[in-house]
């Protein structure tokens, strides 16, 4: 099929080449022989009057013209797939959809494992690829290379639809033997104590508390920098260092490590974790089903963890009461 002299099948070939950066892999992806893919490249070069790709070692490197074509071609193909091509009615139990989701280890441990467990029961052929957060997550959504991202709302753009999942609060955490956390933590002490801090994923994305401090021109003392939340607790053991982590995640690690939890000094805010998806998938039945699963599991987790939060608040109040009583006796 041609449009203004362009064989539209060539756009499928161009999209595969941009995604795979390999002639052989691109041909395999769209079920073409390698000679047929080579012929498609020649026709693309002729139509666009540009080399489009150059070989560097065993990898195809796109020209600036090819880079400029990549996003609109991907969007056009996604629009055709989602809006024009007729699809069978969606049946989760029969679906073999693979969802690519960008998220951090905090979300994986405290939330997404419940989602995966439920999907395994209700849609056993549905699979997931969980990827580290990247700087260009907004662009990856636009190109359809990610189906969802799960992030704190302040880190999301307005280019794609999103919906809130659950609220989370941060706490200070240290080794169970850390005597510095036995008394109320002031902001000055928080800033000057040695921190084990996280920069998330390949993007080295600052966590919510780091963004909060940097927005105010403040820098805390960081002794150890790690790339995932799960690396913080082991690095606290046997030291007087502290970390800042989501409460739900701390409660998870508290079952296997001797941790001491302390309230952060005011005014550290709570934050909302949200899910975002490509605007072109807004009406996609499979995406809608997955969103409903995410929302339902978030509501279920929130209802069960409210009891945990109330218990934690009660423990904190009891501890503060005991400390006040001791202080009054000493005075």
UniProtKB/Swiss-Prot annotation:
GO terms for molecular function: DNA binding; DNA-binding transcription factor activity. Residues 6-63 form the HTH lysR-type domain. SUPFAM superfamilies: Periplasmic binding protein-like II, Winged helix' DNA-binding domain. The keyword Transcription regulation applies. Residues 23-42 bind DNA. Coiled coil: none annotated. The keyword DNA-binding applies. InterPro entries: LysR-type_TF (IPR050389), LysR_subst-bd (IPR005119), NodD_PBP2 (IPR037416), Tscrpt_reg_HTH_LysR (IPR000847), WH-like_DNA-bd_sf (IPR036388), WH_DNA-bd_sf (IPR036390). Keywords: Activator, DNA-binding, Nodulation, Repressor, Transcription, Transcription regulation. Belongs to the LysR transcriptional regulatory family. NodD regulates the expression of the nodABCFE genes which encode other nodulation proteins. NodD is also a negative regulator of its own expression. Binds flavonoids as inducers. There are at least two nodD genes in B.elkanii. PANTHER family: HTH-TYPE TRANSCRIPTIONAL REGULATOR LEUO, HTH-TYPE TRANSCRIPTIONAL REGULATOR LEUO-RELATED. This is Nodulation protein D 2. It comes from Bradyrhizobium elkanii.
